Amino acid sequence: MALLQIAEPGQSAAPHQHRLAVGIDLGTTNSLVAAVRSGETATLPDEDGQHSLPSIVRYTQDTVEVGALAALSSAQDPKNTIVSVKRFMGRSLTDIQTGEQSFPYEFAESENGLPLFVTPQGLVNPVQVSAEILRPLIARAEKTLGGELQGVVITVPAYFDDAQRQGTKDAAALLGVKVLRLLNEPTAAAIAYGLDSKQEGVIAIFDLGGGTFDISVLRLNRGVFEVLATGGDSALGGDDFDHLLQEHMQQVWLLGDIDVQLRRQLLIEARRVKEALTDANETEARIILADGSELKQVVTKRDFDSLISPLVKKTIASCRRTLRDAGVTAEEVLETVMVGGSTRVPLVREQVEAFFGKPPLTSIDPDRVVAIGAAIQADILVGNKPESDLLLLDVIPLSLGIETMGGLVEKVVSRNTTIPVARAQEFTTFKDGQTAMAFHVVQGERELVADCRSLARFTLKGIPPLAAGAAHIRVTFQVDADGLLSVTAMEKSTGVQSSIQVKPSFGLSDTEIATMLKDSMKYAKDDISRRMLAEQQVEAARVLESLHAALAKDGDLLNDDERGQIDATMANVAQLATGDDAEAIKQAIERLDEQTQDFAARRMDNSIRVAFKGQSIDNI
């Protein structure tokens, strides 16, 4: 999947064709699908005009019901109507059964300890249930867009582990759908608001969904989202608001112990009341009992706020802890993005604004913001926005390397390498006793640093003070699936290391890439000559420095005539090294090497004599 329409110099790129891709928010309570059409990003509605699909699946003897149809039967058939399946993804049956929450489902255990739902159609696992939710979303997208999808971007919570992420991918694989990328929900929300285009700053993502609350603090720097800290409560969400309202109505109506069906009916009404109070100061709750009698009560916004206030305060406390973990204050947060339908609750917005000291971003529907960000990402990944700074490449367009002595570039990852990729190379010290090494990461095809693009600099300290060339520093370049480059330098004997992250594609357009490639061709011969000269100059400096140290220590092993000849040759090497004749420098170094071979042998003999002085043969 080529994302950049790049051609070699002198050739033309193939005509651009719009590729179909969508973003999917596979949510705990509701799921959505979004796409970029004619430059506009929006969620796609179903035939009834509904954008969100309830993440509910009901299994009957003959059919599988998904979404609103399944929700209608949830009160009458809770055992076979699976809601919030996302909570089961990647978790063991033991974890689920030992948790505080009880479920109406009948479980079985798989061979590897994962939960299986017992249904009229047999045993099904959370991955299969998730696939049933994805199925109508994919069908909706292909019907609306008029063709087969090239792939999808699916969002996942930032805290999802590898097993949960793999389960999400597997759900799509069951449908034969290609997953372009799994995108963290906080990052998707930030992308939807275009925050990725800002140079730098701290962003908070306040995500209060149906089943969970997540607060993520991100630092944006040159297109790279760095997660500073995450927090929240995996058992706090809009569902809990519903449960509190349900219990309140149950107490007011003096219902006492109720069965599963009535509890589900009350819960559905509580959710309706909660949504009504978003725009109204009061509303009427009403249910019809099995005997046909009707119960009514007026619920005010003040009543609702009083019920949920302790839970909202818990979310703010989580924000405070997470900011502390991130090492930033509320005043340093540039923007707060609201995600999740429960952030529509007025009290939530009021408390968030009071805590962060500024109104949160709410112009994009909080239920849809994650799906919209995923759609923007998907559109880029299939190559529909080649000029985007958010470009996430599946191949590396320009080589990545490190600066070495003399301003030379040592390429570590070559251009057109597919990602993700990791490459490592060993470097060593230039001087005796060197305890630190500065690294300069560059991008480009030219031979000298001056002609390449500077990406980042960092320093490795704590290198053992050894002779020049004795220390071994392993430098690893790792580019992940999102095009994020991590460079790590580690001294092998001690394990000390330092690293940095950078996004090579930030601020880089197709035109700039093409220009850099053309220049590398145009100046190839000249660059090679300049590199050869620089290499010989570096070698001359290394040889002269080493020889100066040797003469200072063991110069008395030479007579005056020998010392004079060596000094003269060294002066000649130093003089030639300031010029531009690489071959002359090379020959001068070779003459100096020949001239000092006898001196090197004497030094070796002398070192052996000193080492064995005073020792008997028996001790050797």
From Swiss-Prot:
Transmembrane segments: none annotated. The keyword Chaperone applies. Keywords: ATP-binding, Chaperone, Nucleotide-binding. GO terms for biological process: iron-sulfur cluster assembly. GO terms for molecular function: ATP binding; ATP hydrolysis activity; ATP-dependent protein folding chaperone; unfolded protein binding. InterPro entries: ATPase_NBD, Heat_shock_70_CS, HSP70_C_sf, HSP70_peptide-bd_sf, Hsp_70_fam, ISC_FeS_clus_asmbl_HscA. Gene3D superfamilies: 1.20.1270.10, 3.30.420.40, Actin, Chain A, domain 4, Substrate Binding Domain Of DNAk, Chain A, domain 1. The keyword Chaperone applies. Chaperone involved in the maturation of iron-sulfur cluster-containing proteins. Has a low intrinsic ATPase activity which is markedly stimulated by HscB. Belongs to the heat shock protein 70 family. This is Chaperone protein HscA homolog. It comes from Shewanella putrefaciens (strain CN-32 / ATCC BAA-453). The lineage of its organism: Bacteria, Pseudomonadati, Pseudomonadota, Gammaproteobacteria, Alteromonadales.
